[in-house]
Curated annotation (Swiss-Prot):
It comes from Dinoponera quadriceps. The modification Methionine sulfoxide is found at residue 18. This is Poneritoxin. The peptide spanning residues 2 to 19 occurs in 3 forms and has been given 3 different names. U1-PONTX-Dq3a has an amidated Lys-19, U1-PONTX-Dq3c has an amidated Lys-19 and an oxidized Met-18, and U1-PONTX-Dq3b has no modifications at either Met-18 or Lys-19. The modification Lysine amide is found at residue 19. Expressed by the venom gland. Its main location: secreted. Keywords: Amidation, Antimicrobial, Oxidation, Secreted.
């Protein structure tokens, strides 16, 4: 459902956040 899409979005943003 929408939860999968939400998780996918978060996983896509994580690398950007970790790079600062």
């Amino acid at each position: 459902g929408s939860l999968v899409k939400l998780v996918s979005t978060l996983l896509s943003l994580v690398p950007s956040l970790m790079k600062g």
